[in-house]
Amino acid sequence: MTDITADAVDTRVIEPEDERYNATLIAREDQHESLAYFWVKFDGDPTPFEAGQYMTIGVFVDGKIVQRPYSIASAPSTARDGYEMYIRLVQGGTFTPLLWRLPVGARMRMIGPKGKFVLEPEDDRIHLFISSGTGNAPFVAMMRQALLDGAPRRAVFLSGVSYEADLGYRPLLEGWEAGGGYPVTYIPTVSRPGHPDNAGWTGRTGRVESIVGPVCEELGLTEANTVAYICGNPDMILAAEATLLERGFPEASVKKELYWPKGKEPQGATTSEIAANADE
């Protein structure tokens, strides 16, 4: 992992007060120096959302809003306590160096929710969740809400990262699996097994899209009994989708979270996908 210090690379002045702020950063928990969980709360009543949707959060710098969208990891039923987001610090990024400098209690602007990446209602098939990096957040929200509703659905959760330390929500997911709190099979994988930071890793290796086919074979996941949801790196999303389509999954059974920065559309994205993403 790269040791990143936000303060050392960003000197922009964040405006602490602005009449357009409507929320507060109420809590933060660091996983390590470049991954953290943030909780942001609206000033008034919470805005309802569906598990899988995202909020856009930001601050004002020189009178202009600097903001980015992030999937919500907390359950909709707990929105009154704030919206949880799992975020990576991007060195030289536009927004995250600002976010990393904010103290708990800082004022922010939050808008949303947006997004169509939500569970199909009344779908009793196995849920295959495929994520890379911080793309696991919407799935955690879905599972948390399912538990609160008393209706958890059988799930297989593939989580791909570069380093073992990057596995967000690992204790939660391992706890659900080991204790039977949620009917989930959790399968993490690291893509750089030879790196010193992964010296103690004994689990699966390779990019998460590379294990989709083998896991389907091992667990008997087919187009008849499984619906897939994919979130994370755009190129990963398209590669994982291609594997599932090759295995006979219909397009309607492969759900994708499609937001990426304008001008950074992945190779292979269709015109309709790019247009749909822009609409978000």
Report the location of each language-model feature.
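Conserved S-adenosyl-L-methionine
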Residues: 148-154
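Ser/Thr-glycine-rich phosphate-binding loops at phosphate-binding pockets of nucleotides
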Residues: 132-136
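Reductase modules of NAD(P)H-dependent flavoproteins
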Residues: 2-21, 158, 163-280
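Histidine-anchored nucleotide/phosphate-binding helix
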Residues: 138-148
